[in-house]
Amino acid sequence: MEESSMAQASLICLLLSFSIIMLSNAADISIDCGSSSSHIDADNRTWVGDTDFVATGLTSKFVPFSKFPAELTTLRYFPTGETNCYTNIPVEKGGKVLVRTRFLYGDYDEESTYPTFDVVYDGKHRYSVVTTTFETVTESEAIFIPENGNISVCFFRTLSSKTPFVSTIEVRRLDDSMYTDLGPKEGFILQQRIAYGAQELVRFPYDPYDRIWMPASVFASHLTSSATSIDTTGADNRPPEIILRTSWSQKDMAFYDIKLPFSGVTFYIVIYFSEPLSLGSDQKRSFNVYYEDKQVGSDLIVPPFGAVTQASLRDVVKTELAYLTFEATPDSTLDPLINALELYVISNSGGSGNGTNSTSTSGGGSPSPGGGSGSPPSTGGGSGSPPSTGGGGGSPSKGGGGGKSGGSNNGDGGTNKASEDEKSADSSGKSGEEKSSSNLALPLGISLPTLLSLGAGGWGVWKYFIKPRRHPESELPLKQNISLQVNMGNATVVNAGQ
């Protein structure tokens, strides 16, 4: 009898272990496209071959000029068919997932064609992929809620002369409490995810959800947190602590950005703030954030020391002149700051890829209005050593915000949300920072007037101009501008006004 009970207990433990393994497999998976074998990378991520997920296409392996992880040196390409799909990728039904595809062309076909094509996530959320060099790692990423226990990732030929391909597919399970602004039928198509002041990109293991945060280290006032630890629970999206240890702080600047793929797209922006200094009783940092004339978050931003708050804005349509401004309150003694930012296009409806392969070879087709479009950022290889946080230049739909939510305000055409941790300031320490009541305006991606180099993985053309927020457009000193052509994290001055 005792042996029978022990056998039953062992069987139960075995079944529980199997269930945990199955749940883990449904949560996170890394597919090495074009490979039939598995391997473990330097950051202890397990990569599996792609033969269980795709039945079409051909494989290629090449030796790149630069050093790349093994998973980026193989790929699968699709010389025939209008749409080719990876299917039966396991996920948790109804749970939020992040799906990332990466592309390293490497001139595998020796044609120097620089492929362009679309990727469609789960038959709904579409993004246009543009490769620009042999050695540039291009990526696309979407956050959405799967309706079933498996998803598809499809590659759609947009030009008959261009062959779609893919190097890796990564699926990461997100906590249900994250990205509460995401509606059940929507997708967030990543445009930018930036850690201001960071020296290197940040991802797993420093971000347990394996989001990739690009560094932005430029000639701005760069602050490093003196907090022993930073509580990240005050922000719904759970930014990793390491990106909250650096920030930009600046005044009297405004930037506008043409980074989003085209005017008319609807987007979601979320910004993270953490006070780096233990403020004295005579010090205060408080400000509002505006995208054009729409407030980001419905509450005043008072960054908490040793904690984090987030402010977000969604359902805003991108216009030709898009700028982000941080406006200090009259009683603020310190400049506004920013730690990190995420920017997404909101996908509301499907693309053309429905999880099945199409044999048409005619090509053509345009991106779905609900999806994103444009050239994704370049991120290179793995995370390597811990990202540096010191020195250098500066860097709802439905649902509430993290911490103490400010609710919503739809009167300005966008949905606002802010979360704030109002911990009392430690008056024992005083900052050497100068008193200032001023405005900080940053590009959604990167830039400051003295910027000559850039590490935020942005692209497109950025411009800045000095602009007091409340001045009418006719008074903007547009001659004081500088255009930066951004590619692969480097900036080149192409035009400067007087």
Swiss-Prot record:
Basic and acidic residues bias: start-end ranges: 418-436
Subcellular location: Membrane
Segments traversing the membrane: 442-462
Any Pfam family the entry gives: Malectin_like
Glycosylated position list: N44, N150, N354, N357
Cytoplasmic side: 463-498
Protein name per the record: Uncharacterized protein At1g24485
Extracellular side: 27-441
Membrane topology according to the record: Single-pass type I membrane protein
Start and end residues of each stretch annotated as Disordered: 351-439
